[in-house]
């Protein structure tokens, strides 16, 4: 959606690897109104168009596709793409309609650009899983490549929304990574109770006075359904507010 940063640079780098010497890399930028719920930050979401364009040029992008809203959506639109299982939990529960917007715009972008490969970051793990399911179910002939979460030096996952954080919020937001690592360490030393693990993650996040937890969940990484026992390929996912800024992060317990 723009406001590009070093995590996007990593996506571009991986895309270039898969494109090879004779392939081309396309980047789409579109602040999608369908994936913002009422009262959210759609109007405030950063749109540094010139900076993003220069970013793509310096990164060696061959095509920057930046459509206007009226080019993608008719005023009387009545057709949407909606995944019916993975999108009902985690972010889907907290942000109803969000993934209908994501699937609709991604399907449209796939139809317009017709890529062989598309690259998505694991920070938005649920989005990645839903896009993969959509590609499978709708027979898109596109390979979906997952890229590990890119982080700042202090562990905070890179996000365009990080720039909303004031100094104290930014400092305390590093607790998310610490809490997730706490959960991973517990699993690694034999903890099997999802309740105890998520409780420890919550307690760690609670050490940051400005943190307000939306959810802390242990889920199966394939189905995204909550589980009661820690097992291979479990995922700890968190969503936490710092002031008005909502951040998400996760860690795979492999």
Predicted regions and their residues:
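Charged, cofactor-coupling segments
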Residues: 245-254
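Acidic/histidine-rich
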Residues: 203-246
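Nucleotidyltransferase catalytic core that binds NTPs
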Residues: 1-211, 219-223, 251
């Amino acid at each position: 959606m723009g406001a590009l940063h070093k995590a996007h640079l990593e996506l571009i780098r991986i895309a270039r690897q898969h494109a090879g010497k004779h392939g081309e890399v396309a980047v789409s930028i579109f602040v999608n109104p369908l994936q913002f719920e009422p009262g959210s930050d759609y109007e405030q979401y950063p749109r540094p168009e010139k900076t993003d364009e220069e970013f793509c040029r310096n990164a060696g992008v061959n095509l920057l596709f930046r459509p206007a809203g009226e080019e993608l959506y008719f005023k009387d639109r009545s057709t949407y793409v909606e995944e019916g299982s993975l999108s009902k939990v985690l972010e889907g529960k907290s942000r109803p309609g969000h993934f209908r917007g994501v699937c609709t715009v991604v399907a449209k972008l796939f139809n317009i650009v017709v890529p062989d490969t598309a690259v998505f970051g694991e920070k938005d793990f649920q989005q990645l899983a839903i896009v993969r399911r959509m590609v499978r179910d709708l027979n898109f002939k596109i390979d979906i490549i997952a890229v590990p979460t890119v982080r700042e030096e202090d562990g905070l996952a890179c996000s365009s929304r990080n720039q909303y954080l004031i100094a104290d919020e930014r400092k305390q937001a590093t607790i998310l990574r610490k809490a997730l690592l706490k959960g991973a360490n517990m699993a690694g030393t034999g903890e099997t109770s999802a309740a105890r693990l998520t409780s420890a993650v919550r307690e760690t996040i609670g050490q940051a006075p400005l943190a307000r937890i939306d959810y802390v969940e242990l889920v199966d990484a394939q189905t995204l359904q909550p589980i009661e026992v820690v097992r291979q390929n479990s995922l700890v996912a968190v969503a936490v507010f710092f002031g008005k800024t909502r951040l998400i992060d996760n860690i795979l317990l492999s």
